[in-house]
A protein has these predicted regions:
Chain B
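Histidine-anchored nucleotide/phosphate-binding helix
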Residues: 20-42, 47
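Trp/Phe/Arg-rich N-terminal binding region typifying the photolyase-homology
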Residues: 33-34, 51, 72
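A glycine-rich helix N-cap at a beta->alpha junction
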Residues: 63-93
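Short, glycine-rich nucleotide/cofactor-binding loops
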Residues: 8-25, 57-66
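Short, basic, glycine/proline-bearing loop/turn elements
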Residues: 55-62, 105-110
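Extreme N-terminal starter segment of soluble prokaryotic enzymes
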Residues: 2-7
Length: 119, 136
């Protein structure tokens, strides 16, 4: 089994990139691969707990919690989150808070990296 | 395993989005990556400015005055100061009419490194020799 690291930079609403990243992570984890997710830029928006699932919008909290239960490591860029007014005490439990070198270290140990930035 | 090469491609213009800044800050973070790795392991980032990304390399940004944020110029300078290898596509600065003497230099901060103006073929070589490529 391999190690996959995914870094979606888009927010949940307004783009389907995050939705795709979470579902890809679930598929890889279900197949037994080790999966890491790095959340930075607008991608940090998904860490907020108590998201309301409205049918017109993608929904992340349920998927993120499932991924965490499957052993997927999810880490958010602390500076990016704080800059957007998102604090640790209102985030989904189990998500790590760190900085960009966490991502580089995961890249080092990954067989594949999917970097979904540049928008 | 020991060191691996990572290519950071910056292709977006400055300040239009957060993208260029993120490319640079992710690359700069290589300095402390060993906190999470074993002895002898590490990453070697190479930052390449191509397309409209070369506009990030023009000196004398006024972002603090206009936007109240740290300039991308200061990120470029800090990157040079921490010995990052940074490349600017020669064809693209020529295409946009940017003279080489308008590019950022961190000599005033004591940096040994300089932005390296190289043909695109050299950037392709960097891509070919990198384990992973990140496009910003």
């Amino acid at each position: 089994m391999g190690t996959l690291t995914i870094a979606p930079f888009a927010s949940l609403v307004g783009s389907k990139s995050m939705d795709f990243a979470l579902k890809l992570a679930k598929t890889a984890a279900d197949k037994g691969h080790k999966v890491n997710i790095w959340l930075t830029s607008n991608g940090v928006m998904i860490v907020k707990a108590n998201q309301k699932h409205l049918k017109d919008y993608s929904h992340a909290e349920k998927y993120v919690k499932e991924l965490l239960e499957k052993g997927v490591e999810v880490c958010v860029c602390e500076a990016c989150a704080l800059a957007r007014g998102i604090h640790k005490n209102e985030a989904i439990e189990g998500i790590k808070w760190d900085a960009m070198h966490w991502y580089l270290a995961k890249i080092y140990n990954s067989d594949r990296v999917i970097h979904m930035g540049g928008e | 395993m020991s060191m691996i090469d990572l290519a950071f491609i910056i292709q977006r213009p400055p300040y239009k989005s957060e993208t260029s800044t993120l490319g640079l800050t992710h690359a700069i973070s290589y300095q402390v990556v060993d906190m999470f790795l074993d002895d002898g392991q590490g990453v070697i980032p190479k930052v390449c400015f191509i397309g409209e990304g070369v506009f990030n390399c023009i000196s004398e940004h006024k972002s603090m005055e206009n936007y109240g944020v740290t300039s991308i110029e200061s990120h470029v300078k800090n990157s040079l100061l921490v010995d990052l290898d940074m490349y600017v596509c020669k064809e693209d600065i020529d295409r946009f009419g940017i003279p080489e003497n308008r590019l950022v230099d961190a000599e005033d901060m004591g940096a040994d490194k300089k932005l390296q103006i190289v043909p695109f073929s050299e950037i392709q070589n960097i891509l070919n020799n990198s384990k992973h490529i990140f496009i910003f």
